[in-house]
């Protein structure tokens, strides 16, 4: 499979050299290394050019949205579209460290399962690169029943839990590059729902990155209401009913084209409000 590494950057000077060095140290070197920069004013681009040399492809963010979630999602979708000539795209945050076999491992899973998306686990590190307690899967746990669940049950789980972290994921651009991401959804959350609806989602227990936890993260380990009971979540839904209704509408209109008959039923009914609130 032809492979692209896609890194989205913004003011990435403190960490980018280590991140790109870990990409270049892979057992399977990517065919393309694409960096999409969102208006950095520090030395991000100079560092990237020095580390990667002529192999680096630099893109500039096209979105002007002031909404953080919409902006992040748009950046990754723009980057994925730029990599659509490749069969696999390995997604990366600007401050994480890739384990040496990450590309080889995730490409193998994409191929073996004909998957749209593979989401791996990761260790946690601090700003200095030191390991800290926990892992991505401990922060965003996946129900143990996932592996044996029927497709409809997996769809319910994907609606209820955030099952994929973008910086630890690999995707197929031919399946996802043309998929519009509704406002209010992050790219990794929406793509994981599309892949689950199509029964093409792989949750990988292997730790493939060191995920950096810093105060400057755009999206961190905030689980929000993921573990809250239905009562608290329904209360939250009432307080933000307009946003919730928009998200439900996005699910009902955006996912059915990808859903199998086993998963489409989960995209309708009151359970959506309960799962998304």
Task: Report residues per predicted region.
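Short loop->beta transition adjacent to catalytic acidic/histidine clusters or analogous donor-positioning motifs
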Residues: 1-3, 24-35, 43, 55-57
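Short, well-formed alpha-helical segments that are part of the catalytic scaffolds
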Residues: 12-25
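Acidic helix N-cap motif at the loop->helix transition within catalytic regions
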Residues: 17, 42-50, 101
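A conserved acidic beta->alpha catalytic loop
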Residues: 37-46, 63
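Glycine-rich, basic loop-to-helix element that forms the pyrophosphate-binding segment
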Residues: 63-84
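Short beta-strand-to-loop acidic/aromatic patch adjacent to the donor-nucleotide binding site
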Residues: 86-95
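Conserved donor NDP-sugar-binding/catalytic core segment of glycosyltransferases
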Residues: 97, 102-134
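Conserved nucleotide-sugar donor-binding catalytic segment
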Residues: 145-224
